């Protein structure tokens, strides 16, 4: 018998669901390795991410169930359960690392933007023709003008980069705060979900106990009705030998015919 099943059937059920997801993740990443199309890779990564999210939620349920049973278990059992939970977390983290790796590779493969575009051949020929018709002073003036334009473009670029960095910093801080808030909300929702599942199981247990009590009461009622019926039959027909007397229930014997004796003085 599985040691976790011996501790709690609910723990064993959660472990089975987690193992099913781990098998699906293993097969999914093997399939992803063979996919060459970027769009199909992206869809496959989304499906695997959803499975990892479900697995994380189940591991949280597993941890809560361990804590709820901790006081009733011995030290070796608690150590075994905690080791199993840590093994689950480690395996899930390995799949998360794989997902990040494939996501990074996919982003790199999709990036096809050239940072610098070289001048076209016709434009280069036009510049050569213009330069051949200009004097040295004009060429120097033109060069200085182009350098000034380049310096101004660099300054504008620096300002844009600095503004982008500032916006990125503010956005990062806002996203961090929102992420922490969402994490707290998710934890609260997981706790509520776990409590609802426990309450549902408790209601089912109470329902089964009530049904059992009703069956026992019905059986006792039938016994009482049977005893009353036997007593009535014995009273109505006391000479019926087919019905035995009920132990502990005495019936008065039928009155014998008595004769009145008269004393004559």
From Swiss-Prot:
Tissue-specificity statement: Expressed in roots, stems, flower, siliques, expanding leaves, but not in mature leaves. Not limited to dividing cells.
Location of this chain's protein in the cell: Membrane
Keyword Nucleotide-binding among UniProt keywords: no
Membrane topology: Single-pass type IV membrane protein
Coiled coil regions in record: 30-75
Gene3D superfamilies, A to Z: 1.20.5.110
Keyword Transport: yes
Keyword terms of this UniProt record: Cell cycle, Cell division, Coiled coil, Membrane, Protein transport, Transmembrane, Transmembrane helix, Transport
BP GO terms, sorted: cytokinesis by cell plate formation; protein transport
MF-aspect GO terms: SNAP receptor activity
GO-annotated cellular components: cell plate; endoplasmic reticulum; SNARE complex
Segments forming domain t-SNARE coiled-coil homology: 144-206
Matching Pfam families: Sec20
Membrane-spanning ranges: 216-236
PROSITE patterns per the UniProt record, alphabetical: T_SNARE
Record topological domains on the Cytoplasmic side: 1-215
InterPro entries named among the record's database cross-references: NPSN/SNAP25-like_N_SNARE, Sec20_C, T_SNARE_dom
Subunit structure: Interacts with KNOLLE to form a t-SNARE complex. Does not interact with SYP21, VTI12 or VPS45.
Entry similarity comment: Belongs to the novel plant SNARE family.
Record's function text: t-SNARE involved in diverse vesicle trafficking and membrane fusion processes, including cell plate formation.
Name of the protein described by the UniProt record: Novel plant SNARE 11
Organism: Arabidopsis thaliana
Gene it is expressed from: NPSN11
